[in-house]
Amino acid sequence: MTDTNSQWIEMNLQRQRKMLEDKQKQKRHQSAGSVRTTSTAMSMNSMKDYPTFDNSLPFSISDNSSVSVSMNTPLIPTQDPIAQPRMQSMPRQQPQQVQESLISIGDYPDNDINAKLSKVNLTSCVVSDDEDEDKRSYADSPWNTDVVADRIPSEVLPDYNFIKNNLAKFVEDPAVEHCLYKCSITRQKSGVDKGMFPTYFLHLEEFDTDKRQKIFLLAARKRKKSTTANYLLSTDPTNLSREGEGYCAKVRSNALGTQFTVYDSGQNPKKTTNHAAIRQELAAVIYETNVLGFKGPRKMTIVMPGIEPPTENRPAVRCPVRPIQDKHTLLERYRLNDLDSLKILSNKSPQWNDETQSYVLNFHGRVTQASVKNFQIIHQSSPEYIVMQFGRISDDEFTMDFRYPLSAVQAFGIAMTSFHGKLACE
């Protein structure tokens, strides 16, 4: 009787597998001819006006504007605040031959995934369904080899000499407008206790020289004797302490690891009477909790101070937020909808791909491995203008690209929140 039941169960399983394979095959045939392709020229032709972060509106564009700006989009100076880019020259290809630089960050079945990708010409996509993929292997860079993607085709290249000579000022000030900063983050776990408390190093990639050098910007490490996540950021990689001369910021979380605040090096308002010495809040990051246990991409909201526009006598500066009471903090102001002089950003929602059964984002060749840590930051009024993007390229290497209005400290602090485990978000 037991053998009969086993045979019946096995036959049932085989029949279900066959039905699932036929269904997937039919779905592939239906959608193979209409897979979205990423055409750089077409994307650039649709660009008109681009967002600015002045003190009045979130972005100075009309509601009907067509906006499409990627992290690899050139910005050409005109009379507009952010101008229409020049088209890149690309080899002529048929639409189905242009590969999408998509990174998968959601759930999927592992079986026959390579076959699924090849059916729709997405063989360079990588997929994942776990929080910690450190031990897994992934595909190579998904960027189409016919496109030159290792140079920043933006309007203005970073002033590398200024950055080297004025490191502390550069990391704290808002980024220069029309300039993209391509950075990398290295996670170092070596040492007795660095498996639990790794050190993170942020470097700016230098592209206007033949040597492709990297400029050290910041280092970060989680404090050992803290009950919640508490990361110290410093421009001195040899002294990651509050007493060090390079100490410039810290990132603090709540108990669940779902809400984070990025502070500058100022003092706690409870420990000083000097208002000018009180710490500023540079950003707050809120991860949406997942109380029902549904797995999927993380949802982030970033609250940050607004930017005072530049004048003849000074560049653009950040509006100071120095809360003395809890109700004046960025997190509380966001909860109470008190958003005057604040900017609200969020992560770009990935798109579900039926063929790979996963969520995907286009990182334009800067991210090569799947992870729920990967994200792109946008303003909802201009979802194609990527303010920041972060993602994995190897077990302990990540890329972090950012633009105005973020500073290096703000961007690095936001990246630190992605490294920290979130009990209620998985």
Curated annotation (Swiss-Prot):
Stretch list, region Required for localization to cilia in AWB sensory neurons: 16-28
GO biological process: chemotaxis; lipid metabolic process; positive regulation of neurogenesis; protein localization to cilium; protein localization to non-motile cilium; receptor localization to non-motile cilium
InterPro entries on file: Tubby-like_C (IPR025659), Tubby_C (IPR000007), Tubby_C_CS (IPR018066)
Recorded phenotype for the gene knockout or disruption: Twofold increase in fat content. Extension in life span. Defective in chemotaxis. Reduces AWA cilia complexity and branching from the AWA periciliary membrane compartments (PCMC). AWB cilia are severely truncated due to elongation failure during postembryonic stages and AWC membraneous ciliary fans are significantly decreased. Increase in localization of PtdIns(4,5)P2 and PPK-1 to the cilia base in AWB neurons. Reduces lengths of ASH and ASI neuronal cilia. Mislocalization of GPCR proteins to the (PCMC) in AWB sensory neurons, such as srbc-64, tax-4 and arl-13.
Gene Ontology CC terms: axon; cilium; cytoplasm; dendrite; non-motile cilium; periciliary membrane compartment
Keyword Cytoplasm: yes
UniProt xrefs under SUPFAM superfamilies: Tubby C-terminal domain-like (SSF54518)
Impact noted for substituting R252A: Abolishes localization to the periciliary membrane compartment in AWB sensory neurons
Expression sites (tissue/organ): Expressed in ciliated sensory neurons.
Gene3D superfamilies for the chain: Tubby Protein, Chain A
Localisation per UniProt entry: Cytoplasm; Cell projection, Axon; Cell projection, Dendrite; Cell projection, Cilium
Keywords in alphabetical order: Cell projection, Chemotaxis, Cytoplasm, Lipid metabolism, Sensory transduction
Coiled-coil blocks: none
Region of interest called Disordered, as start-end residue ranges on this chain: 19-39
Family, similarity comment: Belongs to the TUB family.
Subunit relationships: Interacts with rgb-3.
Name of the protein described by the UniProt record: Tubby protein homolog 1
Species in which this protein is naturally found: Caenorhabditis elegans
Gene giving rise to this polypeptide: tub-1
